[in-house]
Amino acid sequence: PSNSSAASDVYKRQTNPTLYARTGGKLDDFHNHIKRICEIVDGPVSAESVAMTRDEIIRDGRELAALADNVVVKIPTMVEGLAATKALSEEGIPVNMTLCFSVPQAIMAARAGARYISPFVGRFDDIAEDGISQLADVVAAVNNYDFGHDVEIIAASVRSANHVTQAALMGADIATVPFAALKKCVQHPLTDRGLDAFMKDWEKVQQA
């Protein structure tokens, strides 16, 4: 969660094992941590299962979904995850399939019943591949089909204002944006320059 009240207008929140580890949180407090986030966020909150088998992921998913009405269960895009996603979605539990890096993965996630699919942008850039192009391919491919349920694409691993811009242009439904990048999205040097000029001109009016 952000330390700024401005973040209260963000539509969706995400967690994953790495983000939680960075908080220094304890395993025993993880569920309480998710509950606290859900209490302050009006929209969906993605909470990730760390299980590796179908049955264990389903068990985790049910436990996470029981924490709050706005929990979305995050599941890695893998064979066991696809099977668990199908089962959970049939129970009415929304799933966000994460760690998606290809069009075939995204299509299979949607067919399994995933409500959200999270292709990672920044991690492609880390290995000198174009993450935005990969995101565009996923968006285009998923939009080609009617899966019989709503599917939204989350641009994940977004690291800059340019990533946000490109994700919007490519048609991603949602972007997960760290607070530092979110602040940069609001800032522009011409805005600062214009505001400075306005204030100086207003001072002249006051002194007239």
Label every PLM stretch briefly.
Residues 8, 15-87, 121:
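Active-site beta->alpha loop and helix N-cap motifs at the rims of alpha/beta catalytic domains
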Residues 142-208:
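C-terminal alpha-helical cap/extension of soluble enzyme domains
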Residues 8, 56-60, 104-111, 159-172:
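Catalytic cores of alpha/beta
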Residues 13, 17-20, 117-127, 172-191:
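Glycine-rich phosphate-binding active-site loops on the catalytic face of alpha/beta enzymes
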Residues 1-7, 11:
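Single conserved hydrophobic/aromatic residue that forms the stacking wall/gate
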Residues 46-52, 70-79, 94-107, 118-128, ...:
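Catalytic beta/alpha-barrel core
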Residues 31-45, 82-91, 132-149, 200-201:
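Alpha-helix-loop-beta-strand connector modules within alpha/beta enzyme cores
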Residues 16, 73, 109, 167, ...:
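Conserved, mostly hydrophobic/aromatic
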